């Protein structure tokens, strides 16, 4: 089945259209079927991003410009289900989608370019991707480059022929990078992946599966990093939107 034939419903939260993937397999089939990969930018949407959209016009324009916005946070999935009771939408965590996409890229021989992360973490990520899924990494660049080196890096990405470009720089830096790089190399699938390389290489622990399944990943992070409290308190505003139906 060609990827053009795989569709996904679109649900709107606070004016933001989100792809409604049923599960990981649906996400992969939507993005990537029979070697025909969609071109565009993937952005994971969680409650924190929903708040940032309201607070920052630049963030809103960056995220609105991305073609593929999907529900990465459990609270966003719950809001979609509340607003659209018939919706068959599931959480597709960005870190899991990236791994699934890399496994698929390995099978298909798709050229991949990795951007971001610390040099040591990036090197370990490349080594593990090649060992685990035989991923065709055509080139990579850690996150430590100067603004004046961006144009040369964009040209490197274009000249590498990469069809998947994953960018681990945190928001909104990674979204700005992807927007600008696409002007030079539009024929690729771009994915912002935050701290995914750190998790993949074991430098940062994710919440255990049981916590994830209960939708308590945020609590696990808070208990392991109390400095996140201020960030988490901001999310109370999102809960207010959810429970008062302002979505």
UniProtKB/Swiss-Prot annotation:
EC number: 2.4.1.180
Record-level GO BP terms: enterobacterial common antigen biosynthetic process
Reactions listed under catalytic activity: UDP-N-acetyl-alpha-D-mannosaminouronate + N-acetyl-alpha-D-glucosaminyl-di-trans,octa-cis-undecaprenyl diphosphate = beta-D-ManNAcA-(1->4)-alpha-D-GlcNAc-di-trans,octa-cis-undecaprenyl diphosphate + UDP + H(+)
InterPro entries noted in UniProt: UDP-ManNAcA_Trfase_WecG, WecG_TagA_CpsF
Alphabetized UniProt keyword annotations: Glycosyltransferase, Transferase
Pfam families on file: Glyco_tran_WecG
CDD domains in UniProt: Glyco_transf_WecG_TagA
GO MF, one example: lipopolysaccharide N-acetylmannosaminouronosyltransferase activity
Biological or metabolic pathway of the protein: Bacterial outer membrane biogenesis; enterobacterial common antigen biosynthesis
Functional summary from the UniProt entry: Catalyzes the synthesis of Und-PP-GlcNAc-ManNAcA (Lipid II), the second lipid-linked intermediate involved in enterobacterial common antigen (ECA) synthesis.
Similarity remark: Belongs to the glycosyltransferase 26 family.
Protein name: UDP-N-acetyl-D-mannosaminuronic acid transferase
């Amino acid at each position: 089945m060609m990827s053009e034939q795989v569709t996904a419903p679109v649900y709107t939260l606070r004016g933001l259209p989100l792809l409604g993937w049923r599960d990981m397999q649906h996400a992969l089939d939507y993005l990537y079927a029979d070697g025909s990969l969609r071109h565009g930018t993937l952005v994971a949407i969680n409650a924190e991003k929903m708040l940032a959209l309201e607070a920052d016009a630049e963030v809103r324009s960056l995220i609105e410009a991305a073609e593929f916005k999907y529900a990465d946070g459990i609270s966003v999935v719950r809001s979609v289900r509340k607003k659209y009771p018939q919706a068959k939408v599931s959480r597709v965590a960005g870190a899991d989608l990236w791994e699934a996409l890399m496994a698929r890229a390995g099978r298909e021989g798709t050229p991949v370019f990795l951007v971001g992360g610390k040099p040591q973490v990036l090197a370990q990520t490349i080594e593990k991707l090649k060992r685990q899924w035989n991923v065709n990494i055509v080139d990579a660049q850690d996150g430590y480059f100067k603004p004046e080196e961006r144009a040369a890096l964009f040209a490197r990405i274009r000249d590498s022929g990469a069809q998947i470009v994953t960018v681990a720089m945190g928001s909104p830096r990674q979204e700005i990078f992807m927007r600008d790089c696409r002007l030079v190399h539009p024929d690729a699938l771009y994915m912002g992946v935050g701290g995914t390389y750190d998790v993949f290489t074991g430098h940062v622990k994710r919440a255990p599966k049981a916590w994830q399944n209960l939708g308590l990943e945020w609590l696990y992070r808070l208990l392991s990093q109390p400095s996140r409290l201020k960030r988490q308190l901001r999310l109370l505003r999102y809960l207010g939107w959810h429970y008062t139906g302002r979505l």
